[in-house]
Amino acid sequence: MTALDKALVAPKNLNEDELAKMLASTDEGLWREIFAAAREVKAKCGKTEVLPRGLIECSNVCAKNCLYCGIRKGNDKTVRYRMPEEDVLGCINEVRRRGYPAVAFQAGEIEGEANTAYYERHIAMCRGLEVTLSLGEQTEEVYRRWKDAGAMRYLIRIETSNRELYAKIHPAECSFERRLGCIRMLKRLGYVTGSGVMIGLPGQTIDDLAHDIVFYGDENLDMVGMGPYVAHPDSLMPDSRYQLPTTNYQLSLRMIALTRLYLWNVNIVAATALEALDPENGRRRGIDAGANVIMTNLTPAKFRVGYDLYPGKVKT
């Protein structure tokens, strides 16, 4: 039985070595079979319907200085903003007008009472909508308060499951253990919990990416949001490449397909970063590869320009 045959029998039926060998393959015929198999599993699990989420980028103020990020604390070229309540409410109303069942609040990572209360108020405005938060590392008390206010899902990206690589792309004050602890805390508190990685980081290997997929399963994630690494001109990242079998874009599509084959029933986001590299077809190809969630950016244009995570970031 081939690895692909095994993947179609049951979830988590591939080992890390098999995932790595598939990721490293340059056989286009094999990849056509893998993408078709991912679609087959998606249909088998009832994941063919694309789930829309209205995305609101509430603030680009961030206390973290992650080396890769355009809105990192140390980037003094970024004009900072925090959306006033009336603008947030306007976005929530637009989510309802479009008939989307869910809204997602995303922002730079800030802790403190003012920030906690800001999102409590906005979550309370979303009655009748499913609320996803992507607001980074917080205390257990804060996560509890937001859940009590009505939040249902939380996405906190680990960016890489390789601790050594994590340390290379973050300043010393950013703790891998704390971030992993937040993922586990969110699960324990009853959130529908998601995480994900960047694909194509300097120093990253195929073995790292295969381990990332296994990490998703080991942590029993409900959602996965991952996408290609797109270098920001104001980044502090080293300008180095490793040898990949293909581009960050193609490898991201392959990661989506293999994550679907490994986890089966998970919700996978077709990341906006795919359209930074393929503006016409990026997210559609993500859906074809096995994803089933689309985030539509509803942030007003006057704020959206400031949420500059990476070059070419899609504005819709």
For each feature predicted by the language model, list its residue ranges.
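Conserved, mostly hydrophobic/aromatic
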Residues: 38, 66, 156, 186, ...
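Flexible, acidic/Gly-rich N-terminal and inter-domain linker regions that tether
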Residues: 1-64
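Core AdoMet radical
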Residues: 73-89, 95-183, 192-199, 222-225
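Auxiliary Fe-S-binding modules of radical SAM enzymes
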Residues: 1-27, 96, 217-316
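Catalytic cores of alpha/beta
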Residues: 139-146, 202-216, 276-288
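Conserved strand-turn element in the central/C-terminal portion of the radical SAM core barrel
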Residues: 110-113, 182-208, 226-234, 245, ...
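Glycine-rich, proline-tolerant flexible connector loops at the mouths of alpha/beta enzymes
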Residues: 53-56, 76-79, 103-116, 164, ...
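Canonical Radical SAM [4Fe-4S] cluster-binding loop centered on the CxxxCxxC motif
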Residues: 47-87
